[in-house]
Amino acid sequence: LLILLSVLLLRGGVVAAAEPCQAPRQWEGRTVFYEHGSGRNTRAAVSYDGPNQRLRILEERKGLIPCKKFFEYILLYKDAVMFQIEQVTKLCSKIALTEPWDPYDIPANSTYEDQYYIGGPGDEIMVQEWSDRKPARKLESWVGVYTVKDCYPVQETYTKNYSVTTSTRFFDIHPGIADPSVFTPPSTCQTAQLRRMREEC
């Protein structure tokens, strides 16, 4: 029995008293953000600065998409402001942030859901799945998948009104911020307009 229990622990079948790991507080990488309502995928390079509550998102061009604009977003939560910069013209919009800072991590009061491997034999990564599910509320509004080693985000999914609304996949992550100036808005934002720009022409 002890041998069987040890095997299950190693393979991720059973995890006793799992505790949320501490995710990196600063990193850069790439994401795919999927809006389930519209069916739209947005690929982007991301710089994440947890201590200063800053996020920079640079949309990636993947092929020619007719009449599609690509933007850079600089979100400064401590200042409650977001800058939207059109990548070609550098036109800038300054928009108030109304949502609170939501870090990429596993909250301390999260519920452990599962542990498993992603990938196949010889090329696999162990991850843990956590949620905000509580005993009095059977359904969760957030599910996060993080690597066991180094606690990097793999996927986060949000649900509302019993349906999945958004999901984000993370990849190519490396710790630290190579150039902190990416969080500084360009000079065109000194005369920014106060309305969000349309993504289509």
Annotate each language-model stretch with its function:
Residues L10-E19, L97, Y104-M126, A136-W142, ...:
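Non-transmembrane domains of secretory- and envelope-associated proteins
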Residues L1-R54, T89-K90, Y116-P121, V182-C201:
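N-terminal leader/targeting segments and the immediate start of mature chains
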Residues V46, G144-V145:
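A residue-level detector for well-ordered beta-strand positions
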Residues G29-E35, R56-K62, V127-A136, G144, ...:
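Short beta-strand segments that buttress and anchor functional surface loops
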Residues R43-N109, T157-D172:
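An acidic-aromatic
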